[in-house]
UniProtKB/Swiss-Prot annotation:
GO terms for cellular component: nucleus
Superkingdom per UniProt: Eukaryota
InterPro entries, per the entry: EPHD, PHD-type_Zinc_Finger, Znf_FYVE_PHD, Znf_PHD, Znf_RING/FYVE/PHD
Species assigned in the record: Rattus norvegicus (Rat)
Molecular function terms, GO-annotated: zinc ion binding
Zinc finger map (PHD-type): 91-143
Name of the protein in question: PHD finger protein 11
Annotated Gene3D superfamilies: Zinc/RING finger domain, C3HC4 (zinc finger)
Function statement: Positive regulator of Th1-type cytokine gene expression.
Length: 336
């Protein structure tokens, strides 16, 4: 149960357009005032709740509007939070090895990701700039520099948005407009037969330069996740089957995955065979036990009447149950 400190969440009309649905700020009624875990954000429409710090330090999540120091509530769009949760499903925590690790070390070359609570346990170093509204985490192996002027020229410049750009000490690069003009000219000069190859590689490079490559791959993975859900629900269409078949077997991109999947099949086969052997051993043990019980009955060690009755009560208990007192018999007669 939490105390509500914001109006109900939902799309808000602003001059004919809809602003993004935002998370509601709640305060845990059982936490002490001011505790870092007491502030929770909740989205009733999506049934999602998250701690404030888990949201603030998530590498791929930013607020959907400028933070107002006079308003303690944060502006987290529900759509962005759902996207970050989905992104975290593919990230394993460097400490607990479980999914959902959206808090990454802010050094671009470091691959460590945490849950916020695991980052604290691992003594990760937080870096907060209230004026800029940035919340960063550095793993213990990569403590942050005290001043930007002390960083090396080839060190990365990191932003809260999760888009990391390395500074280059090499020759100056061409402006983007010039690059794009050259790209269009090359497109016109390429023969038709090589046009597809000329388009695809530069297209992905342009996505990278525009900071949209991650967005593109996230949409691809989201599409795959949606198809996977339909397969699990047994609602997949014929086009879903054809699409996955083409992706896996026709394009050759996932040949290594199929080879690894063969190893998974072998491993599962061995696992189930081992289970089957264990079940056979248990069945044999039960059969031996039944045979021993039968031999005890033949030798008179067990009362046949007791074994056929299907009850574990001693014989005297059966007699007590069967012999009713005169009062009980009289009562039963009266009831009739």
């Amino acid at each position: 149960m939490a105390e509500e400190t914001a109006p109900p969440c939902g799309p808000v009309s602003t001059g004919g357009s809809l602003s993004p649905e935002k998370m509601e700020k709640r305060t845990c009624a059982l936490c002490p005032d001011g505790h870092e875990w007491s502030v929770i954000y909740f989205a009733p429409s999506a049934n999602i709740a998250a701690h404030e710090n888990c949201l603030l330090y998530s590498s791929g999540l930013v607020e959907c509007g400028p933070h107002d120091p006079r308003n303690p509530a944060r502006s987290f769009a529900v759509k962005s939070v759902k996207k970050e949760i989905w992104r975290g499903r593919r990230l394993k925590c460097s400490l607990c090895n479980k999914g959902g690790a959206t808090v990454g070390c802010d050094l671009s070359s470091c691959r460590k990701s945490y849950h916020y609570v695991c980052a604290k346990k691992d003594h990760a170093i937080p870096q907060v700039d209230e004026d800029l509204g940035t919340y960063k985490i550095f793993c213990p192996e990569h403590p942050p520099q005290q001043e930007e002027t002390t960083e090396r020229a080839d060190s990365p410049s990191v932003k809260k948005t999760g888009k990391k750009k390395s500074l280059s000490s090499g020759p100056p690069t061409e402006p983007k407009k010039m690059k794009f003009s050259r790209f269009k000219r090359l497109m016109k000069e390429e023969p038709h037969g090589h046009k597809d190859a000329a388009v695809k590689a530069p297209f992905l490079k342009k996505c990278l330069e525009a900071g949209l490559l991650t967005e593109l791959f996230e949409q691809i993975l989201e599409k795959m996740d949606s198809i996977h859900g339909r397969f699990m629900d047994e609602t997949a269409s014929e086009s879903d089957y054809e699409g996955i078949k083409t992706l896996l077997f026709d394009c050759g991109l996932f040949g290594d995955i199929l080879r690894k999947f063969q190893e998974v099949i072998k491993s599962k086969t061995c696992e189930y065979e081992e289970r089957l052997n264990q079940m056979k051993q248990k069945l044999e043990a039960l059969a031996d036990l039944q045979e021993n019980l039968c031999s005890f009955q033949e030798c008179g060690d067990l009362d046949p009447s007791g074994s056929t009755s299907g009850s574990l009560l001693p014989p005297e208990d059966h007699q007590c149950r069967c012999q009713e007192s005169p009062e009980v018999q009289a009562g039963s007669g009266d009831s009739l």
